[in-house]
C-alpha cells in the first residue's frame, strides 16, 4: 500500500513526470525544486505568468495580495492562495487547490483539488487529489531525535533515507512518515503514526475500521 501506484492518481497533477520510475512517493521529495525549474519554462506563457524567478502562476489562479510566494513554485489553474499564505518554495499547488489563511507550505506537491484551508503547516509532504486538512492540522516532518524517518506498515518497516518526511495523502495531526490511503478519514484530535489502509476510518490507534 506504500507505492506510488497504490496511493496516487497521477492524472490529477501537473507533476506526474516527477514520480516516473519511483517506487515510493517520498522518493520524489528531494527532486521537487529541480523539477519545478525544469517544468516552469515549458509552461505556455499565454496560460501562466512568471512574476518572479522560478515562480509560475496560472493566469486564472486567485492569489491574494498578502500571500507570499517564494520560488521555486508552480501554482496551477484556478488554485486559490488566500490571505497571508506563506509558500516557502519547492511547492507545486494543483488545479483548484486551496492554500488558506496563514498556511505554510515547504517542499510539497499538492495534487488537484487539495484543500489546506486554515492554519495548516505542510512540509516535505505529498497530498493526493481531494485530500483535505482540517483547521489547525499540521504535518510534522522531523523526528525529535533527528534520525532518519522510517515508514511503518504493520510489522514492515521501510527506510526512507531522509531526515524530513511529513505525510503522504495525509490529514489531521500527523507524525513524520505517516501514510494515509485514499478515501480514508481521520477523527479530529487524532495523532496518527504509521499507515492507514484505503477506505478506512481512523478513530484512535486501537480503532481503525473499514468503511461500510
Where would I find each of the regions flagged by the language model?
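Terminal amphipathic alpha-helical/low-complexity segments used for targeting or macromolecular assembly
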Residues: 1-54, 199-200, 205-212
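Short gly/ser/thr-rich secondary-structure transition/capping motifs
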Residues: 43-48, 60, 116, 155-158
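Right-handed parallel beta-helix
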Residues: 60, 77-78, 83-84, 95-96, ...
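Glycine-rich hexapeptide-repeat left-handed beta-helix
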Residues: 15-17, 101, 110-113, 117-212
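Glycine-rich beta-solenoid repeat tracts in large extracellular/virion proteins
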Residues: 68-69, 86-87, 104-106, 121-123, ...
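Glycine-rich active-site/cofactor-binding loop and its immediate structural neighborhood
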Residues: 57-102
Amino acid at each position: 500500500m506504500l507505492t506510488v501506484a497504490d496511493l496516487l492518481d497521477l492524472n490529477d497533477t501537473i507533476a506526474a513526470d516527477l514520480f516516473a520510475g519511483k517506487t515510493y512517493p517520498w522518493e520524489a521529495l528531494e527532486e521537487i525544486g529541480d523539477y519545478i525549474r525544469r517544468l516552469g519554462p515549458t509552461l505556455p506563457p499565454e496560460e501562466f505568468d512568471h512574476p518572479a524567478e522560478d515562480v509560475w502562476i496560472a493566469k486564472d489562479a486567485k492569489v491574494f495580495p498578502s500571500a507570499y510566494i517564494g520560488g521555486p513554485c508552480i501554482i496551477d489553474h484556478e488554485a486559490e492562495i488566500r490571505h497571508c499564505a506563506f509558500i516557502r518554495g519547492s511547492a507545486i499547488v494543483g488545479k483548484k487547490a486551496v492554500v488558506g489563511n496563514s498556511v505554510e507550505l515547504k517542499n510539497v506537491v499538492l495534487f488537484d483539488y487539495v484543500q489546506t484551508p486554515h492554519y495548516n503547516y505542510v512540509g516535505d509532504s505529498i497530498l493526493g487529489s481531494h485530500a483535505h486538512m482540517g483547521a489547525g492540522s499540521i504535518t510534522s516532518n522531523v523526528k525529535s531525535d533527528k534520525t532518519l524517518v522510517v515508514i511503518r506498515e504493520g510489522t514492515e518497516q521501510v527506510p526512507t533515507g531522509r531526515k524530513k518526511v511529513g505525510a503522504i495523502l495525509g490529514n489531521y495531526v500527523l507524525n513524520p512518515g505517516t501514510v494515509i490511503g485514499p478515501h480514508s478519514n481521520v477523527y479530529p484530535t487524532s495523532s496518527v503514526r504509521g499507515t492507514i489502509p484505503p477506505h478506512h476510518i481512523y478513530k484512535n490507534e486501537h480503532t481503525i475500521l473499514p468503511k461500510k
